[in-house]
Regions:
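Catalytic phosphate/metal-binding cores of nucleic-acid and nucleotide-processing enzymes, i.e., regions
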Residues: 1-91
Length: 91
């Protein structure tokens, strides 16, 4: 499945949960997450990948930085991952 299909699905599902999913791009830093997702009471950095896709080294550094700083971070590969992630984060 194409990454843009999963990304579009994420945006729709987050909106249905009362949140927003901002496209995140940084000209100064490569490897940042694809989306910053704001749900009621929480903010997540979300990286989207195609099935079998892997994080680049820069994406791994970004993930570790965010986790070290106590931020929420998720990598999602499929629509099912999006649904499962939303189930666990919106309980």
């Amino acid at each position: 499945m194409l990454e843009k299909v999963i990304e579009r699905y994420l945006v729709q599902r987050v909106k249905a949960q009362g949140g927003v999913a901002y496209k995140f791009a940084s000209v100064a830093h490569r490897g940042v997450a694809d989306r910053v997702v704001c749900l009621p009471g929480q903010t997540w950095f979300v990286e989207l990948k195609t099935t079998g896709g892997r994080l680049s080294e820069l994406q791994k550094v970004f993930r570790e930085d965010m986790l070290r700083l106590g931020q929420n971070y998720a990598v999602l590969w499929t629509k099912e991952d999006v649904d499962q992630w939303l189930l666990t984060t919106t309980k």
